[in-house]
C-alpha cells in the first residue's frame, strides 16, 4: 500500500470515529427528552380518546367501599386553601367511604363546620367529618407551635391526638387531589408489617437535591423524604412509641431544622429506615418535578395523583400551571357537572400556561380526571 493510500485510510478511520462519537452523544442528549415527549404524547392521545366533550357524570352516588381517612392541620390564614384541598378530596372520593379529619385552631372551627355541613347536603352525604382542636405537649409547647410554620408540627403528635383512629392520609393544606383518594390509600396494603408511614423522596435528582447538599442533620436515604402527603399507620406509630422519640431529636438538632417537623421525620427514619415505605413521586408532585425539566417518570406514565403547591405556587405566579389547577378547583361548585366545570375549565386554564415548562406537561395533570369522570 502506498503512503498516500495509508494516509487516506487513516483519515477515513478518524472521520468514522468522529461521526460515531457525535451520533452517540446526540442519542444520549436526545433520547431522554424524546422519551418524555413520548410519555406525554401517549397521555394526550389517551386523554382525547376516553371522554367525549358532551359527556356528563354523576359524582356523588351512594355506593361505598373502604373507608379513607384524610387529615389536615390548619392554623392562621390557611382556611380557604384547606377547604379547596378538602373539596378536591370530595370530588375524587370515588367509591370510598370518605372521612375528613380537621385539626384546627378553635377560632376557625366554626367556619369548617358550617362549610362541611353544607357540602354534605350538596353531595348527598357523600362523606363524614370530624373537627379537633390543636394540642401540643406541655414540654417545649411554644417551640413546637412555632417550629417551621404555625402549627405545622402538630402532625407529629397525631398518633395521640387521633388515638381513636387506626390509619390516616395526612396532607398539607397546599395540596390538591387529581386522582381517586383510593389511589393513594391502596399503598397501605402494600406496606410490610414493620412499615408505619409512607412518603415520597424530597427530590428525584441528586444534582438539585436539598438534603444531600445542605442538610446538617441525618436524613433518610440519599435524598430525604417530603412529608406533605404522608400515609400514617397510627396504631403502629403508637406501638413504635413515636411521641417519645420527638423531643430528643428536637433537643439535639434544634439549630439545624430548616424544614421543622419534616426534618424531624427524616432524622427518625434515617435511624429506622425499615419503618418507612417510599412511593412514587406522582403522589406528591411539586414544581421541582417540572420547573426545569420533567423528572417524575411515574407522573409521565400514569398522571399526577396529588399536586403539592409548596412554596406558594398556588397563590403566586411562580408556576402558572399549578395556580391554574388551584383556581379551577377553587371555582368549581360541588354538585355541578365536573366535566364541564372542572375538567374542561382546568384544561382551558392549563392551555394558557404552555409557554412554561410545567405547563407543557398539561396532560399529566388532567389524565386521572378523565379516567375518573368516565368511569364514575
Give each language-model segment a name.
Residues 2-68, 74, 78, 220-376:
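A glycosyltransferase accessory/donor-loop signature
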Residues 98-107, 198-199:
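Short internal beta-strands
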Amino acid at each position: 500500500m502506498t503512503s498516500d493510500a495509508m494516509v487516506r485510510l487513516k483519515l477515513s478511520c478518524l472521520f468514522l470515529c468522529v461521526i460515531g462519537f457525535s451520533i452517540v452523544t446526540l442519542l444520549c442528549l436526545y433520547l431522554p427528552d424524546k422519551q418524555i415527549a413520548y410519555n406525554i404524547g401517549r397521555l394526550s392521545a389517551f386523554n382525547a380518546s376516553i371522554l367525549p366533550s358532551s359527556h356528563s357524570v354523576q359524582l356523588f352516588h351512594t355506593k361505598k367501599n373502604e373507608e379513607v381517612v384524610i387529615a389536615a392541620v390548619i392554623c392562621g390564614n390557611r382556611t380557604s386553601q384547606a377547604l379547596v384541598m378538602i373539596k378536591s378530596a370530595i370530588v375524587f372520593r370515588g367509591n370510598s367511604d370518605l372521612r375528613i379529619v380537621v385539626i384546627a385552631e378553635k377560632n376557625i372551627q366554626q367556619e369548617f363546620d358550617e362549610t362541611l355541613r353544607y357540602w354534605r347536603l350538596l353531595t348527598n352525604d357523600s362523606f363524614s367529618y370530624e373537627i379537633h382542636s390543636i394540642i401540643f405537649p406541655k414540654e417545649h409547647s411554644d417551640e413546637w407551635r412555632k417550629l417551621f410554620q404555625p402549627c405545622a408540627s402538630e402532625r407529629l403528635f397525631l398518633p395521640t391526638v387521633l388515638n381513636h383512629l387506626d390509619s390516616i392520609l395526612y396532607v398539607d393544606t397546599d395540596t390538591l387531589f387529581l386522582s381517586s383518594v383510593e389511589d393513594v390509600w391502596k399503598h397501605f396494603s402494600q406496606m410490610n408489617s414493620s412499615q408505619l408511614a409512607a412518603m415520597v423522596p424530597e427530590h428525584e435528582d441528586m444534582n438539585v437535591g436539598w438534603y444531600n447538599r445542605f442538610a446538617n442533620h441525618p436524613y433518610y436515604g440519599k435524598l430525604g423524604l417530603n412529608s406533605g402527603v404522608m400515609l400514617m399507620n397510627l396504631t403502629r406509630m403508637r406501638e413504635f412509641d413515636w411521641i417519645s422519640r420527638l423531643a430528643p431529636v428536637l433537643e439535639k438538632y434544634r439549630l439545624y431544622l430548616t424544614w421543622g417537623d419534616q426534618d424531624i421525620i427524616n432524622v427518625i427514619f434515617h435511624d429506622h429506615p425499615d419503618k418507612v415505605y417510599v412511593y412514587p413521586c406522582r403522589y406528591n408532585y411539586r414544581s421541582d418535578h417540572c420547573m426545569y425539566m420533567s423528572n417524575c417518570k411515574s407522573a409521565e406514565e400514569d398522571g399526577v395523583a396529588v399536586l403539592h403547591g409548596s412554596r406558594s405556587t398556588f397563590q403566586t405566579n411562580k408556576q402558572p400551571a399549578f395556580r391554574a389547577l388551584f383556581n379551577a378547583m377553587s371555582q368549581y361548585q360541588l354538585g355541578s357537572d365536573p366535566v364541564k366545570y372542572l375538567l374542561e375549565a382546568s384544561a382551558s386554564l392549563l392551555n394558557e400556561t404552555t409557554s412554561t415548562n410545567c405547563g407543557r406537561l398539561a396532560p399529566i395533570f388532567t389524565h386521572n380526571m378523565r379516567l375518573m369522570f368516565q368511569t364514575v
